[in-house]
A protein has these predicted regions:
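CN hydrolase (nitrilase-like) catalytic-core segments centered on the catalytic cysteine
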Residues: 63-83, 153, 159-248
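Short, acidic/polar
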Residues: 19-30, 163-169
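Cys-nucleophile CN-hydrolase/nitrilase-fold catalytic domain and related Cys-dependent amidase chemistry
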Residues: 17, 26-116, 185-201, 205-207
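Short polar catalytic/cofactor-binding loops
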Residues: 10-15
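A conserved C-terminal secondary-structure "cap"
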Residues: 257-276
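Extreme N-terminal starter segment of soluble prokaryotic enzymes
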Residues: 1-7
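Active-site catalytic loop in hydrolytic enzyme cores
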Residues: 93-174, 187-190, 196, 262-266
């Protein structure tokens, strides 16, 4: 890994799946034409809102489901690594809630990895929507995922996971060099915490962070923060977006990783290890 260009795609997805996929297609093409070899989509890129996730999830149990097929075909078309935000995937048992699955596809369209979102956003906030209950629709994942890529070891996380630093410490123990974190932070929490949490995860784990967010007004009661960002292992913001659709890009460089880790050899000094 040396000088690999990566991109984060910011969207304002709604409930119209066909429209969302078309916007994703255009934005991914923009990133690829700019030289990106790894492109990361935001959480819920294909459907964001009150649409029935169970109907989508049932179709995506099959690797040939429409959303998974879209991701595979798009990765293959552009010859890129593609992190597909999250899509709902039904469980094996009929009564089991779907998982919010984040897929990584290779340049040839093959599936390299799947991460199911572990930490579900069940909170009450003083905003227009007020009540968020992801666990009403989804079951939590159970397994950490870190996969070898041309960008180095790529760790996967999603949105609310960001608030649980022990998860990323465990990924660091598995050799993570780059973290992809598809997200849909609310405007309220994003304005307060988004950048500081992302910079903290980059600095404390000495990794690159690629964090695409949903960014805008989705409905009368839903607004996300935006502010998609790419951060280096020293905590420097290499690229950022405001609100609305955007594509941001930067270079992931092995020499920068090595320099940060040599300057502050915290991995060698670590005395406490997170189980798992």
């Amino acid at each position: 890994m040396s000088g690999v260009r990566v991109a984060a795609v910011q969207m304002v997805s709604g409930e119209d799946v066909a429209r969302n996929l078309e916007r994703a297609r255009v934005l991914i093409a923009t990133a690829a034409s700019g030289g990106a070899r790894l492109v990361v989509l935001p959480e819920a890129f294909a459907c964001y809102g009150s649409a029935d996730v169970s109907a989508l999830a049932g179709a995506e149990r099959d690797p040939a489901g429409p959303l998974r097929s879209f991701l595979a075909a798009t990765a293959r078309e552009h010859g890129i690594l593609l992190v597909g935000g999250t899509i709902p995937v039904a469980g094996e048992a009929p009564a089991e809630r779907p998982r919010a699955a984040c897929f990584l596809y290779a340049e040839d369209g093959s599936e390299l990895a799947r991460y199911d979102k572990i930490h579900l956003f069940d909170v009450d906030l003083p905003d227009v929507q007020r009540r968020y209950r992801e666990s009403d629709s989804y079951a939590p994942g159970e397994r950490l995922v870190c996969a070898p890529t041309a960008c180095g070891m790529l760790g996967l996380g999603v949105c609310y996971d960001l608030r649980f630093p022990e998860m990323f410490r465990a990924l660091g123990q598995r050799g993570m060099d780059v973290l992809a974190l598809p997200s849909a932070f609310t405007r309220l929490t994003g304005e307060a915490h988004w950048h500081v949490l992302l910079r903290a995860r980059a600095i404390e784990n000495q990794v690159y962070v690629i964090a695409p967010d949903q960014g805008g007004r989705h409905s009368a009661t839903r607004e996300t923060w935006g502010g998609s960002v790419i951060i280096d292992p020293w905590g420097r913001v290499l690229a950022s977006a405001a609100s609305g659709e955007a594509v941001i890009a930067a270079e992931v460089d092995a020499a920068v990783l090595r320099d940060a880790r040599e300057r502050l050899p915290v991995r060698a000094h670590q005395r406490f290890y997170v189980p798992g």
